[in-house]
């Protein structure tokens, strides 16, 4: 046997499974390239820049669409709120605008930056260790700047008064407004943690329940607080309207407390190891169904005899 044939045989054996199973082919290792494009995972600065760009574009797209829809709802004379309450059609239009806008924005940019689009969500993700503190700060800056840019763009492109800023209504006090914002944000952030962070087969559909939860939050809170549940949304609208009420702080403190509350509930479930319990329940249910099916089959066989 020539030396070339021997080398070819050695190379072939190196590609086989070391256990000796000849049909288990293992492809040869590819040479490591030195091109910087293939080391992007180690380029932290570039990764942060991509995340910042994704959060800016996603937040801008979400809030610009929502602001314009909100402006239309509040300018339409047929949907003007009565002095003693809000028009149902007005609430539904605003809620649909925000819910659907965040839904398609998350679907577009979740693969780029995670699609938080909300400083309160970013805080919950950071507390859950889904993103690093540095990435959280980067996302915060992008989201807040995008909120102000979206507010300015919506104000410049639509005629008339800016009518998408948050304000208290229906006699709601600052304390009540604080807790409404807190619990509304908690529901939204908990939805994110349970549908996007938790490993499930339905993670790819997380944008749908997130959009639905924001829709419900707007139906519930708009008449009382204008529904902030997002500091970037509240700040962007306030800058565009040049309207900063003395209670503007509730749209920051309330939402951040809500994100912490959502994380606390999620963390409690992790401590209780709820996934093990759910898995055991599913296994027991499957076993019980299999036993019943076996008993039914046995009974049918006896009856035939």
Curated annotation (Swiss-Prot):
Pfam families (alphabetical)? MIP (PF00230)
Which compartments does it reside in? Endoplasmic reticulum membrane; Cell membrane
* Skewed-composition ranges (Basic and acidic residues): 286-295
Q: Which residues lie on this side of the membrane: Cytoplasmic?
A: 1-48, 113-136, 198-203, 270-305
Extract the ranges annotated as region (Disordered).
Answer: 1-34, 286-305
Keywords noted in UniProt: Cell membrane, Endoplasmic reticulum, Membrane, Repeat, Transmembrane, Transmembrane helix, Transport
List GO terms (cellular component aspect).
Answer: endoplasmic reticulum membrane; plasma membrane
Motif range (NPA 1) = 118-120
Q: Does the keyword ATP-binding apply?
A: no
Motif span (NPA 2)? 230-232
Which Gene Ontology molecular-function terms are recorded?
water channel activity
Q: Which regions of this chain are Extracellular-facing, per the record's topological domains?
A: 70-91, 158-176, 225-248
Skewed-composition ranges (Polar residues): 296-305
Q: How does it sit in the membrane?
A: Multi-pass membrane protein
- State where it is primarily located: endoplasmic reticulum
Ranges annotated as spanning the membrane: 49-69, 92-112, 137-157, 177-197, 204-224, 249-269
Family, per the entry? Belongs to the MIP/aquaporin (TC 1.A.8) family.
Comment on protein domains? Aquaporins contain two tandem repeats each containing three membrane-spanning domains and a pore-forming loop with the signature motif Asn-Pro-Ala (NPA).
Query: Which PANTHER family does the annotation name?
Result: AQUAPORIN TRANSPORTER (PTHR19139), MIP17260P (PTHR19139:SF199)
Q: What job does this protein perform?
A: Water channel required to facilitate the transport of water across membranes. Involved in sporulation, freeze tolerance and osmotolerance. Is non-functional in most laboratory strains.
Its recorded name reads Aquaporin-1
Q: Which organism is it from?
A: Saccharomyces cerevisiae (strain YJM789)
Q: Output the lineage of the source organism.
A: Eukaryota, Fungi, Dikarya, Ascomycota, Saccharomycotina
